[in-house]
């Protein structure tokens, strides 16, 4: 529950041993976050459909309502980078990573949470989804036939969100706003209220951000 690795077997057969403190599990915390308080049950209404028991191609193609796009094998790059509060410097660094990923043959490049705007002073650095920095990412994606997913602090309708944008050759494809907020997020951001996935020419792409991944319901 504290995020530490208790034991590892990374290859071959074996038995993993570790001493565990059961009191940690009784705290109902993960990485010092009270996860049970941060659940969003109203967002999990689709879970009883049990789609995980189906072959995805059969489930999503049922009655032709929401068929999956034709899939393909693609090279995806996940970037790890440190961001500052200087958006221009962050954007320059992002383009440097994009150039490397493009040259390696990547078709989708994923940047971290808040990569574009930084982790400090989110309200002051927040941008709208049609500001020049987002448009520059979309223009790069269009010119290089590339899909880009990038986190940023978003200002929308007088609210602030921890968001991620997906851009591609088509332009700005969509925005996902983080649904599960941790303590840091709650100090500045509003909760998102919709899961987002997007059909692209490389397949269906669903978005989550950081703390979302702690919750199996996501």
Give the positions of each predicted feature.
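Active-site catalytic loop in hydrolytic enzyme cores
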Residues: 1, 31-34, 127, 155-218
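CN hydrolase (nitrilase-like) catalytic-core segments centered on the catalytic cysteine
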Residues: 1-16, 130-149, 213-218
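C-terminal beta-strand edge segments of enzyme domains
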Residues: 1-72, 197
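Alpha-helical scaffolding within the catalytic cores
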Residues: 57-64, 133, 193-194, 213-216
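Short beta-strand segments enriched in small/hydrophobic residues
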Residues: 67-84, 88
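Active-site metal-binding loops of divalent metal-dependent hydrolases
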Residues: 81, 114, 212-213
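Cys-nucleophile CN-hydrolase/nitrilase-fold catalytic domain and related Cys-dependent amidase chemistry
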Residues: 87, 96-177, 184
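Short, acidic/polar
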Residues: 89-100, 213-218
């Amino acid at each position: 529950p504290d995020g530490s690795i208790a034991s590892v077997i990374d290859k071959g057969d074996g038995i993993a041993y570790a001493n565990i403190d059961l009191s940690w599990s009784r705290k109902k915390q993960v990485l010092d976050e009270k996860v049970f308080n941060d659940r969003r049950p109203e967002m999990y209404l689709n879970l009883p459909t049990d789609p995980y028991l189906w072959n995805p191609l059969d489930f999503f193609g049922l009655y032709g309502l929401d068929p999956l796009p034709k899939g393909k094998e693609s090279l995806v790059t996940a970037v790890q980078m440190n961001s500052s509060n200087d958006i221009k410097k962050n954007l320059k660094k992002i383009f440097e990573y994009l150039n490397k990923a493009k040259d390696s043959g990547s078709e989708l490049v994923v940047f971290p949470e808040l990569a574009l705007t930084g982790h400090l002073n989110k309200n002051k650095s927040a941008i709208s989804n049609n500001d020049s920095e987002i448009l520059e990412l979309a223009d790069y994606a269009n010119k290089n036939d590339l899909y880009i997913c990038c986190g940023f602090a978003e200002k929308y309708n007088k609210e602030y969100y921890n968001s991620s944008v997906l851009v591609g050759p088509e332009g700005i494809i969509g925005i996902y706003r983080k649904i599960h907020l941790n303590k840091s997020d709650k100090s500045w951001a509003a909760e998102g209220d919709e899961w987002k996935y997007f059909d692209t020419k490389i397949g269906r792409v669903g978005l989550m951000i950081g703390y979302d991944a702690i919750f199996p319901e996501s």
